[in-house]
Design a protein with these regions (language model features):
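Short, glycine/serine-rich, charged loops/turns that create anion-binding
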Residues: 11-12, 42, 110-111
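Glycine-rich phosphate/pyrophosphate-binding loop and the adjoining helix
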Residues: 137-204
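Helix-loop-strand module that forms the ligand-binding subsite of alpha/beta enzymes
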Residues: 53, 57-133
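Residue-level recognition of beta-strand->loop/alpha-helix junctions
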Residues: 8, 39, 137-139
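N-terminal beta1-alpha1 ligand-phosphate binding loop
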Residues: 1-33
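N-terminal beta-loop-helix "entrance" segment that forms/cooperates
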Residues: 37-56, 146-152
Length: 204
């Protein structure tokens, strides 16, 4: 079963970004996919700022990302840029850390103008790490939150629909990638079998 790593790049607690990340992952778990969560705010700040990849907690976080089949990244947008916390983590990753993976970028913010940070700020960085595919990004405006006495109850219908559709599209990409890998494996096995048969015939 494919493993998805959901990465929260928010330094805040409580965090609207983390809540949106959980909502985005709900359709994925409903499809039977395994989703693990990594909250970057729980990593040691000094190790991140010093780019100390040898720190046990940081090294474990990097290893979890590299082992995942797909990644959902969620970040708040500050001054038209993704969070510094997420940047320090991405800077620690190997050049091709996302190779073969499907990535879904999410962002939250207080202005629709901040949505540009996804396509012009975060996406180019992700593409430089050689992912198999980057799904359509979703920006969630803070005013779309529906809150009750116990916190976030959900999102406005239009926003929730966009988020659910993005999650479903992301899962479809992951399924397509897995199917492609299986087909390639089958073709390779057939070629190896054909070569072996040809060799046996020549030997006979």
């Amino acid at each position: 079963m494919p493993t998805i790593l959901a990465v929260s790049g928010s330094p805040s607690l409580p965090s609207f970004t983390h809540e949106v990340l959980a909502l985005a992952c709900a359709p994925l778990t409903a499809r039977g996919l395994r989703v693990d969560t990594l909250a970057l705010r729980e990593l040691p700040a000094q190790a991140l700022l010093a780019a100390d990849g040898g720190d046990p907690a940081v090294a474990d976080a990097v290893a979890r990302l590299e082992a995942a089949d797909a990644v959902v990244l969620a970040t708040p947008v500050y001054k038209a840029a993704y969070s510094g916390l997420l940047k320090t983590f991405l800077d620690l990753l190997p050049q091709h850390a996302l190779a073969g993976k499907v990535v879904l970028p999410l962002a939250t913010g207080g202005s629709m103008a901040h949505a540009l940070a996804l396509d012009y700020g975060l996406r180019p960085v992700l593409m430089s790490m050689a992912p198999a595919a980057v799904a359509n990004a979703v920006f969630v405006h803070a005013e779309s939150a529906l809150r009750g006495p116990e916190g976030l109850r959900g999102l406005e219908p239009d926003t929730r629909t966009r988020l659910d559709q993005a999650a479903e599209g992301f899962a479809d990409l992951l399924d397509a990638l897995a199917l492609h890998a299986l087909l390639n494996e089958a073709v390779t096995d057939d070629l190896v079998t054909a070569e072996r048969l040809a060799g046996l015939r020549q030997a006979a």
